[in-house]
Amino acid sequence: MAYTQTATTSALLDTVRGNNSLVNDLAKRRLYDTAVDEFNARDRRPKVNFSKVISEEQTLIATRAYPEFQITFYNTQNAVHSLAGGLRSLELEYLMMQIPYGSLTYDIGGNFASHLFKGRAYVHCCMPNLDVRDIMRHEGQKDSIELYLSRLDRGGKTVPNFQKEAFDRYAEFPEDAVCHNTFQTCEHQPMQQSGKVYAIALHSIYDIPADEFGAALLRKNVHTCYAAFHFSENLLLEDSYVNLDEINACFSRDGDKLTFSFASESTLNYCHSFSNILKYVCKTYFPASNREVYMKEFLVTRVNTWFCKFSRIDTFLLYKGVAHKSVDSEQFYTAMEDAWHYKKTLAMCNSERILLEDSSSVNYWFPKMRDMVIIPLFDISLETSKRSRKEVLVSKDFVFTVLNHIRTYQAKALTYANVLSFVESIRSRVIINGVTARSEWDVDKSLLQSLSMTFFLHTKLAVLKDDLLISKFSLGSKTVCQHVWDEISLAFGNAFPSVKERLLNKKLIRAAGDALEIKVPDLYITFHDRLVAEYKSSVDMPALDIRKRMEETEVMYNALSELSVLRESDKFDVDVFSQMCKSLEVDPMTAAKVIVAVMSNESGLTLTFERPTEANVAQALQDQEKASEGALVVTSREVEEPSMKGSMARGELQLAGFAGDHPESSYSRNEEIESLEQFHMATADSLIRKQMSSIVYTGPIKVQQMKNFIDSLVASLSAAVSNLVKILKDTAAIDLETRQKFGVLDVASRKWLIKPTAKSHAWGVVETHARKYHVALLEYDEQGIVTCDDWRRVAVSSESVVYSDMAKLRTLRRLLRDGEPHVSNAKVVLVDGVPGCGKTKEILSRVNFDEDLILVPGKQAAEMIRRRANSSGIIVATKDNVRTVDSFMMNFGKTTRCQFKRLFIDEGLMLHTGCVNFLVAMSLCDVAYVYGDTQQIPYINRVSGFPYPAHFSKLEVDEVETRRTTLRCPADVTHYLNRRYEGFVVSTSSVKKSVSQEMVSGAAVINPISKPLHGKILTFTQSDKEALLSRGYSEVHTVHEVQGETYSDVSLVRLTPTPISIIAGDSPHVLVALSRHTCSLKYYTVVMDPLVSIIRDLEKLSSYLLDMYKVDAGIQXQLQIDSVFKGSNLFVAAPKTGDISDMQFYYDKCLPGNSTMMNNFDAVTMRLTDISLNVKDCILDMSKSVAAPKDQIKPLIPMVRTAAEMPRQTGLLENLVAMIKRNFNAPELSGIIDIENTASLVVDKFFDSYLLKEKRKPNKNVSLFSRESLNRWLEKQERVTIGQLADFDFVDLPAVDQYRHMIKAQPKQKLDTSIQTEYPALQTIVYHSKKINAIFGPLFSELTRQLLDSVDSSRFLFFTRKTPAQIEDFFGDLDSHVPMDVLELDISKYDKSQNEFHCAVEYEIWRRLGFEDFLGEVWKQGHRKTTLKDYTAGIKTCIWYQRKSGDVTTFIGNTVIIAACLASMLRMEKIIKGAFCGDDSLLYFPKGCEFPDIQHSVNLMWNFEAKLFKKQYGYFCGRYIIHHDRGCIVYYDPLKLISKLGAKHIKDWEHLEEFRRSLCDVAVSLNNCAYYTQLDDAVWEVHKTAPPGSFVYKSLVKYLSDKVLFRSLFINGSSC
């Protein structure tokens, strides 16, 4: 990975050096982004401050050794062994990183002050005073704590929050933080510690005997111990002195005493036992008990420090196969001594144990051994004659360089002196090309003489071997030893006359070859350790319990799934969100839903900040009164009248606060009108705000818009005053463009330092001699502005809105009620018209000047309307009924008329939506017509930094009227308008082509002499406008300024060559610019831009095409009809092929394992075996527990093996199991519901969603209970049923709360594999007597008929009394080209989940359909608390509510309940198709519709366990709905057909033929094989193992269509 990053960076750098500037910029940006990402990643690492002074090389050592940390080197503290001391803190943090945060930790010999500073309240330090140095170190730690606290006191600070818990623990219970016992004897007892215990040992393990370490850890129940200590591999080579170069320290060994010290400085040394340290290094197992052991594992070595961990191991978890019987020798001898009089065999038996054995090996690497050899050195004492031999490591290259060279010496030259001379010369220097250079071998010079002796002896021996080899091992009369000593005597002469005798006595000659051998050392040394433990029992390996964390994770993932709908959700900080929920103890799902609701503006709350930074969120959440630092005051505080003068006096300017809604339709205005003169000489600071708007807006959207409008005035006023103050503070630094907008008057000299372009300013900002700034109302005399003595300068602005904003704020503040704006109940109608559609003309034609009011944005528009309205000579339009918006707001309450009937706002969409809401409320009108253009320039927020959320820009209206005929625009512009507007735009203009363009070479070309411009001159920007005015052009305006105006000819000019964002293909400014003229428009531009492309395209249009947009008069009405789709299925007859094995194969692939279940005797097994049932209160007649014997008729045996069950026999146990499954243990999922009111709301949605508008009210003229309805009901009954009514007098009703209970003999097959693990309970029938059905049956039959007649059958299907062909017709107009979401709601335990709320919904539906109140109350009581009696099985019980499976309303009741349930949660007005049948439902919605959390809503309101599935094809009532490009076809489920072919209840061949005919009726569509491929896809959606099934569909058709062939699917059971 590192190589890849390096290669990528190098490639990018090479790219940057190229000549392509674009590629260079991209590469530089990539490098920048990579660097930012890398620094951000480093920023997330734990931070460690390294204060000690170290060198640059040491800085690099620390950084590379600990990449897990972000280390900051301050170099502010000189200290002894500064690197090692600084690394101590890094080593501690590295050890603590290995431990889960918050787990109880023992720091053996640790620094408790370090843990306090880190805020670790879960660490206990064992710090025994083993010597005086330990006492000194402990006192130093306490001193550091006192120093830290004194610094906090001196700075007036308190202990930070993250440290507080740890310091409190040390202050109240110091023994919990630190004790002065050894770890082996520590008495600390943790309080309420449920997690695992850990330990760390930082350079303290030396002082704990290795044999006691395991037991000490077990006594504290330590799970894992992490340790760090200094060591060097060279100590294993028995070196007496070892350097630790990186930290500049050393080890020296003297026997078992090992001393650690720092070189090049005077500091205390540390002494330890070498044998004890060696045990920690070389051992692997540290026994803790006869069962548990701690196993050591090395982790890493960093800067001469070894890190390891000791893990607690339970030997009983070992696989029992590793245990074997063996004899424990110690136990054997003990037994023999204690019981010698017993037999030896008995002693052997007593000593026999089952032992567990394990072994380990550790390799130690010696990097310094590489390219080294071991050389023996010899010495002998002349005084004591004692010889000695030692070994040293010498460079392999050096050794063999010397040996190879001296091997070339002649026999006479091969002397010790010559060898020593050569060795010393190459050690001191080496000659390269005649130049002497420093030797490359750094051999200790003190060893050169001894090395030379070894080299000399080694060479002599080698010469001898060569001679022996040459002579073919024939040595004559001399032995090898004699040859050796002859050579030695010849070389040394008489130097050592007695050496030979001594060596002979010591028998050295025999080992001469071995003694002189040069060995190559191993790079690794292996240490072995063995564990032997007694096997007593075997324990299963426990699993880690992470259920709680996974549950929390599941909740968090669900919350994040909820948040995924937000924009830029991929950048959502999950860690911050999780920490927030944890710290505030908030449910993540609740928090997520609140966030989504707020961000999607569905909560009645608006957050105005764009980015949820810490500052913004803090401002949103903090107390508003505390947040008002001189400027912010929430108007919702309890004051009777908000006073602007009081606010100014306090130095405050109020913002709109929190929401409340007052629906009254009139104002009670304050009679005391504040005057603007009261704010003369108010301080500028009281108007300048740091915060642009309220952070939070609450209340209905209109209220939020109105509050935002108030804040926009405050922000505009603040910006204007702030700019004038800035001008006064720095007059000399004003640029040329700013000088054209502002003016500064020097009061002393009465001269304009900056002369303004306009005159007679009403307001300005005054700077006094005390350098104070005030807002002043300016007055004039013949000398100009009237000034005061303490004034120094006066600043004015030609764009200043101080006067108007203050006046509007004064008005709006007086209209607030307890700080809340009032929303009018008037009807608001938006008239959306294309440019030039005659909006002003329409206003004049509709207005009644005696009772209506017209408001327009500008003065020119107001004067134009007055002029046109009074053109006949009669004055009807005055300044009272035709006004500008600013005038109406500023002077509100000063005129005689305060209430108007209708309000007309021209160009209302150019206003702030909150302003429009205020205007409607202030006019007290009944209807407000807002004329505007949704595609032209909207309201533009011109205050930088002021938030105007996107949803605030949408005006809330009650109706929208469109005008799509333009009276102004020529045909070519009309063609462009059709691209921008919905609906067909036409024009009454006779001009066809009107637009043109001209590219000019530069801005200097545009001047009145060389380039006179025809007609009205327009620009896009103010800078272009000022440039044209300065060159002598007159009457120049921007496009924004002339919106709503009409000119015959227009010259549109662009002088700015840089990109302008408002010139784009879909820009509203372009639309306004193209639609101002009636005859011609010419565009002059210095650059090619999108508008040039648009004009060129319009120039190319043919006249024939433009004629299509021309009409003689405006269109009064347009009839719009939606497209209708109706198709027919393609029919391709299915070939009749296949065999029984095809059906069996397909069934086994879809439902693997079902066909292998031998379930013929399941019912018998259940009766004969013990069974435990959980039942509610019921009465059982045990005399019915044994069913009466019946003659068994052997049914036909199916050849297709399915999960079909044998018919069951009614009995106490069978019926009780069915009752438990179908009626007992009803789920209780719903929350607290206002049943009556909620049911009424649900039924409202039901009627609005499904019923035709004209049939939503019942026909009271039709009687539900009549002879005709009774006859219709009787026609559907069997004769047996009618016979039961022969003795019924219809005078009184039987008990309506009494039901009978029975079961169906045949279990229902499920199309899943549950049969393999469950005993399928039978379906129950709970039914009334026929006497009750005779009363209510006709009633509900008539109610059902009325309901079905009222349903919008084009979109909804209530599947009652429908044939499969009718289902196909209903879905036949589905258009497969329209993207759709196919929804299925799957509800389990549907009948028994229905409670009082479901009954209330159903009764309310019947009541609104005309159900008579008395009978309705009787029916309601009969379904509240009901008694069930099963006379056959002897069972009696009581149930509340629930759906009765044999009731007269079972099917239609279930159908309306599922429909009402879905209508209460989904927006049915958007639905394409919907079908309901019992508990089945199928919905088709347009693609992309948003759906609520169905499961949550169904649980809480409807008490249903439900899941909502999105599919490609629908599945409804056992049929697949296959929509295609020609319509729709309905296929019966082929798997369900095959399941039925395995039926085991067919009595005889006649019964079989009836069975075949019924299957043929439902499966007739399988004869059409045109859509088998789509059917395969639909089946695969439900059964993922299903193969393509065309072969089995054809097989089904083959057998179903031939009654003779169909008989082959069964065999006669009586013959078997």
From Swiss-Prot:
Residues 964-1116 form the (+)RNA virus helicase C-terminal domain. Residues 1380-1493 form the RdRp catalytic domain. It catalyses: RNA(n) + a ribonucleoside 5'-triphosphate = RNA(n+1) + diphosphate; ATP + H2O = ADP + phosphate + H(+). Residues 50-458 are annotated as: Methyltransferase. The lineage of its organism: Viruses, Riboviria, Orthornavirae, Kitrinoviricota, Alsuviricetes. Residues 72-281 form the Alphavirus-like MT domain. This is Replicase large subunit. One of its GO terms (molecular function) is RNA binding. Belongs to the ssRNA positive-strand viruses RNA-directed RNA polymerase family.
